[in-house]
Amino acid sequence: MHKVLAIETSCDETSVSIVSNSGDIYKIHSNIVASQIEDHSKWGGVVPELAARKHLELLPFVLEQALEESKIRIEKIDVIASTVTPGLVGCLRVGSITARSLCTLYSKPFLGIHHLEGHLSSILFSKNYPKPPFLTLLVSGGHTELIKVGERRKMQRLGRSYDDAAGEAFDKVGRLLGLSYPGGPAIAKIAKKGNASKFNLPKCKISDKEGGFLKYDFSFSGLKTAVLRLVEKINLNGDEIPIPDIAASFERVVAEVLVERTIKCANDYGLDNIVVVGGVAANDTLRKMMISEACKKSIKVHLAPINLCTDNAAMIGAAALYRLKFKAYESSLKLGISGRLPIDQANTLYENKPPF
């Protein structure tokens, strides 16, 4: 059994977790998350410099609380891991330097973890998670991707958003409608009072230069613009904006686009298991629609636990534990951080010559 201390500071959550595994059973001993939503809500989104400063302020206390709650002394930890890519560079640096400093101080191995692999690994804390190969829909504030996951974490990106990620579109539309930040939960809440069929919003596609459309890729910028034009038109007519109806219609279209393209991709590639992870995976409309539509194709859906959909260190620890199963992974203490790295290059974080 391995015990991992994991740190996540890629955006606006400061999180430390102690996790372990016994074979294929993964356990969370502690998972402390300090959110910065109140600090950023007044600006309508994350301010990178402010986020990095808050990580510096909060991380020592979050680390202490995680160790105390787990009742595991740091000397008993086998590996220390942190998110090193992708994310906000200043934020990543805080967590990475802290993790590598602890490794040096306590003579522990270090594992740099890809943030998206962390999200992907959140499913390991659910019951009966699938064995590879399977298709993952990773849908969050910064990313919307379809990833085929093979043995030993061989990953192939099959689809992605070419502009706004789904979560980013939720935030922008929420702000447009005068709702609180973050937009995802705010839209989901008010949409329950609305008519999801009231407005016929577009399901945008990406043109293929060879003709037709890219069938597994996403675009949410046009949908966001359509909502803007709708609001402008209603304002021009002097009518009251039906916020619940617009929110419900927007939420429905986002869910339909995600579900339709995910199921088509899984069906085309002969994959009978779909995993849904990331912050937007907490959306109830998306969860129910994915299960319902996948069932029609005899595809099984595995949903990340609600409390592990948004950024947290437990998922980073799970990714580290999964890597340790192969007994061949350790990152150099010279490994830096990077704002971007495609998920299919995650294995380079454990090579003798680090990618950054």
UniProtKB/Swiss-Prot annotation:
InterPro entries: ATPase_NBD, Gcp-like_dom, KAE1/TsaD, TsaD. Its main location: cytoplasm. Substrate binds at L138, V139, S140, G141, G142, D171, G184, N283. It is an enzyme of class 2 (transferase). Gene3D superfamilies: 3.30.420.40. Binds 1 Fe(2+) ion per subunit. GO terms for cellular component: cytoplasm. One of its GO terms (molecular function) is N(6)-L-threonylcarbamoyladenine synthase activity. The keyword Repeat does not apply. The keyword Acyltransferase applies. It comes from the Bacteria. It is found in: Cytoplasm. NCBIfam families: gcp_kae1, T6A_TsaD_YgjD. Belongs to the KAE1 / TsaD family. Required for the formation of a threonylcarbamoyl group on adenosine at position 37 (t(6)A37) in tRNAs that read codons beginning with adenine. Is involved in the transfer of the threonylcarbamoyl moiety of threonylcarbamoyl-AMP (TC-AMP) to the N6 group of A37, together with TsaE and TsaB. TsaD likely plays a direct catalytic role in this reaction. This is tRNA N6-adenosine threonylcarbamoyltransferase. The lineage of its organism: Bacteria, Bacillati, Cyanobacteriota, Cyanophyceae, Synechococcales. The gene is tsaD.
